[in-house]
Design a protein with these regions (language model features):
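Fe(II)/2-oxoglutarate oxygenase catalytic core
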Residues: 2-248, 252-281
Length: 281
């Protein structure tokens, strides 16, 4: 018998999990394994009105893998990072504007870290208008290619950079901004990610700068076309937040972005990230 009661939200990505209480997620190892299996099948899991407190959120994530502590210090609970445009709550809020574009977390690490396995967000305060989080399957993006496209794209490699993602929201950066962006190393990844499971996905999104060996404009046009095909309305689940909602997604197989909202709105999400254990290859 399944440990999770799941209702599909769209045919392509997303499912709602009902009937759980926070203590179950925080303490039940078998439930953690069931969540990972459900993520593989659905990409995104929504726990409506769960009201998972920060300590329990970190405990839950420990049942899925190793918790990322690289951003500790922004919140009183280690492993929690406040996602907000309010600089009084997050000194690095300016960088979060890039999350309004489709992306996969972890394509431009500071070192050799792998992309994150999963990300959890819990809603503390929500915007009155906008601020949804949208998801699209990067596995689905690959599966929907023609055989000829799969063969051609399998040979391509793409350079990803922090500068590429930041220029989308700050097209005329100051010298200081450029210096900070370029201090982060660029990373070259295959366009097609062959996962340990045998599944394949496309590595797309805001950090994808150019295709190696292609004319820059032609390469960027190809990346834009693939992203547009992957994120048409029928392939997207948009989560409209309510206070107390918790959402987890498979970062390795799902593109995501935040819908724009008024920066004066007190939108606040608490994020915990589960570290990855699989390189893009």
């Amino acid at each position: 018998m399944s440990l999770l009661t799941i209702n599909k939200l769209t045919p392509s990505v997303g499912a709602e999990v009902v009937g759980l209480v926070p203590d179950q997620l925080a303490t039940d190892d078998a439930l953690g394994a069931a969540v990972l299996d459900a993520l593989e099948d659905n990409g995104v899991l929504v726990f409506p009105a769960l009201h998972l407190d920060p300590v329990a959120q970190v405990q839950f994530c420990r049942r899925l893998g190793e918790v990322d502590h690289s951003s500790d210090g922004h919140h009183g609970v280690a492993g929690i990072y406040p996602v907000t445009l309010d600089k009084s709550k997050n000194a690095s809020a300016a960088y979060l504007r890039a999350t309004f574009d489709w992306h996969i977390d972890g394509c431009t690490p500071t070192g050799g870290e792998y992309p994150q396995k999963a990300t959890v967000l819990s809603a503390v305060a929500v915007a009155r208008r906008g601020g949804e989080t949208e998801f699209a399957s990067s596995y689905g993006a690959y599966d929907q290619l023609t055989d000829d496209e799969k063969e051609r794209l399998a040979r391509l490699r793409v350079v990803h950079s922090l500068e590429a993602s930041q220029r989308r929201v700050t097209p005329d950066p100051t010298p200081g901004e450029l210096e900070r962006w370029r201090a982060r190393p660029t990373h070259e990844h295959p366009l097609v990610w062959t996962h340990a499971s045998g599944r394949r996905s496309l590595v797309l999104g805001a950090s994808a700068d150019y295709v190696v060996g292609m004319d820059p404009d032609e390469g960027r046009a190809l990346l834009a076309e693939l992203l547009a095909r992957a994120t048409t309305g029928d392939k997207v689940y948009a989560h409209s937040w309510s206070v107390g909602d918790t959402v987890i997604w498979d970062n390795r197989g799902v593109l995501h972005r935040a819908a724009p909202y008024d920066e004066t709105e007190p939108r606040l999400m608490l994020r915990t990230t589960v570290l990855g254990d699989e390189p893009i290859q």
